Design a protein with these regions (language model features):
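Acidic, mature catalytic/reactive cores of soluble proteins
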Residues: 1-186
């Protein structure tokens, strides 16, 4: 919206992106992250094919719309939407096995119809390649955020520090870590 001044930055020492929307009367932040953390066995890292979006109300009653237009299977076919009470399932007519699930604390029909949303409290969205068997709610989202934050802070704390260009080097290391496989290949 032209009413908002928008700024983006990473949460320091992490791969968690924060986008801030500020106007005279309203302010909110959109925090995007892919979960990444160690399970009970410290050698294994949990990295599901998921993206969380946490929408944090800071002041006022911000208004916005969500433009959800997925193009599964590289947009080779028409996108099919199936809405349940828990999620929006999407897949392509060219490959019905490649499915995505959008979970949200916001009304799903408002997302699909791109209706204006009034942010009265913190909300979340989760885009996943897997249907969830456990309940997806804002408490689960906050837990995933905390685990991911701790993972990245611990990881960057263990990296070498440089006296010159450390911020740029650390950002490069974080991006490379995101793109690396479990065996170390990039």
């Amino acid at each position: 919206s032209p009413d908002y001044q928008i700024s983006q930055s990473y949460v320091p020492h992490t791969n968690i992106l924060s986008t801030n929307f500020v106007s005279e009367e309203n302010e909110f932040a959109v925090v995007d992250f892919m979960p990444c953390y160690h399970l009970s066995d410290a050698s294994n890292c949990y990295r599901p094919a998921e993206i969380y979006r946490y929408i944090r109300r800071i002041k006022g009653t911000p208004r916005f719309k969500i433009n959800y237009e997925p193009a599964p299977d590289y947009a080779r076919g028409k996108t099919i939407f199936n809405t349940t009470s828990e999620y929006i399932e999407t897949y392509s007519t060219s490959n019905s096995k490649d499915r995505q699930y959008l979970y949200s604390s916001l009304p799903l029909h408002n997302i699909l119809e791109q209706k204006e949303i009034v942010l009265a409290k913190d909300e979340f969205l989760l885009l996943s390649y897997n249907e969830k068997v456990i309940p997806v709610n804002i408490e689960r989202e906050k837990l995933e955020y905390c685990r991911t934050l701790v993972y990245w802070l611990n990881w960057t704390d263990r990296t070498k520090k440089f006296t010159v260009y450390n911020d740029v080097i650390e950002r490069s290391l974080l991006v490379l870590k995101l793109m690396s496989f479990y065996n170390g290949a990039v």
